[in-house]
Swiss-Prot record:
SUPFAM superfamilies: 4Fe-4S ferredoxins. The lineage of its organism: Bacteria, Pseudomonadati, Pseudomonadota, Gammaproteobacteria, Pasteurellales. [4Fe-4S] cluster 4 binds at C118, C139, C142, C145. It is found in: Cell membrane. It comes from Haemophilus influenzae (strain ATCC 51907 / DSM 11121 / KW20 / Rd). [4Fe-4S] cluster 1 binds at C44, C47, C50, C185. This is Formate dehydrogenase iron-sulfur subunit. Allows to use formate as major electron donor during aerobic respiration. The beta chain is an electron transfer unit containing 4 cysteine clusters involved in the formation of iron-sulfur centers. Electrons are transferred from the gamma chain to the molybdenum cofactor of the alpha subunit. InterPro entries: 4Fe4S_Fe-S-bd (IPR017896), 4Fe4S_Fe_S_CS (IPR017900), FDH_Electron_Transfer_Unit (IPR051555), Formate_DH_bsu_Proteobacteria (IPR006470), Formate_DH_C_sf (IPR038384), Formate_DH_Fe-S_su (IPR014603), Formate_DH_TM (IPR015246). NCBIfam families: FDH-beta. One of its GO terms (biological process) is formate oxidation. Its cofactor is [4Fe-4S] cluster. The gene is fdxH. Residues 35-65, 97-129, 130-159, 164-195 form the 4Fe-4S ferredoxin-type domain. Formate dehydrogenase is a membrane-bound complex, formed by subunits alpha, beta and gamma.
């Protein structure tokens, strides 16, 4: 995808965690090409080369031997040292047994729930090209990003109490290279480029699948999170849950939206109003509370009857 490389070299931040409309994040200086990774599950063979490529490039090692329980999934789940995992499912569709394989990892949502939920300033950022990246040095280990993710992706590392996930190889993409998983895929099931290019290619793959009898083939790019920068071509796009629980209509939890978009701004306005009221009080009344007390004391002493008067 050499033609896309120039458009994704500059990493401009457009969103930062723990900001709101009252404290807006910086915006990209100009338009940057939105990138996307397209995973065609119909051509994936489950070889796990992408897992190895991710592990090698990011220098992370999950304790896979401890998790091997007689299944193909190994490691059996994402963790702080396994940012991509192959999911294997046997399903019966149209009286046929099908073997569905899906590469699982961060979806890099256009409207990321993790970023919206994060209370730590700068711990999660989103670039103009769509990549959502965690800044581990600013993570406070609260785990709110885990609760805010509709795909259940981020994982806490018990060793340093910080959260990690796939970065979409932002370090490679920023210098015009493709992600490590794309580089290592032997069948071309994982592709990378501008989102527009990937959607055009996905249309071709969907048309091919439909011509082969998969009537409900389609592109998985859920609108509930504004679309994603990791997309899937699925045989059964009408039933994404068949692919190891891929959510059909993922959305940011209402409690997160209510907290960040309603309650937090209202609280900020209330605090601002209180500050203005204090300033107004200072300007109109003045900071003479202690002086008033002292004045009343002097006035009391002056008006206090003498001992002779009391005796009378």
């Amino acid at each position: 995808m050499a033609g896309t490389a120039q458009g994704v070299q500059t990493q401009d931040v457009i969103k930062i965690s723990a900001t709101s409309g009252l404290t807006p994040a910086p915006q990209a200086r100009d338009h940057k090409v939105e990138i996307a990774k397209l995973i065609d599950v119909s051509t994936c063979i489950g070889c796990k080369a992408c897992q190895v490529g991710c592990s090698e490039w990011n220098d992370i090692r999950s304790d896979i031997n401890a998790q091997c329980v007689g299944v193909y999934d190994n490691p059996v789940d994402l963790d702080a040292k396994a940012w991509t995992v192959m999911r294997f499912n046997e399903v019966e569709e149209n009286d046929r047994l099908e073997w569905l394989i899906r590469k699982d990892g961060c979806m890099h949502c256009t409207e990321p729930g993790c970023l919206k939920a994060c209370p730590a300033p700068g711990a999660i950022i989103q670039y103009a090209n769509g990549i959502v990246d965690f800044q581990s040095d600013k993570c406070i280990g609260c785990g709110y990003c885990i609760a805010g993710c509709p795909f259940n992706i981020p994982r806490m590392n018990p060793e340093d109490n910080r959260v990690y996930k796939c970065t979409l190889c932002v370090d490679r993409v920023s210098v015009g290279q493709e992600p490590a998983c794309v580089k290592t895929c032997p069948t071309g099931a994982i592709r990378f480029g501008s989102k527009e290019e990937m959607k055009i290619y996905a249309e071709q793959r969907v048309a091919d699948l439909k011509s082969r009898g998969y009537e409900n083939a389609g592109l998985y790019d859920p609108p509930g999170v504004g679309g994603t920068h990791v997309m899937y071509v699925l045989h059964h796009a009408d039933k994404p849950e068949l692919y190891n629980g891929l959510p059909k209509d993922p959305q940011i939890d209402l409690s997160v939206t209510l907290w960040k978009d309603v309650l937090k701004p209202v609280a900020a306005v209330a605090m601002g109003g209180l500050a203005l009221a204090e300033v107004a009080h200072y300007l109109t009344v003045g900071p003479n509370v202690e002086e008033d007390v002292e004045d009343h004391h002097h006035e009391f002493e002056e008006n206090k009857p003498s001992k002779g008067e009391n005796n009378e």
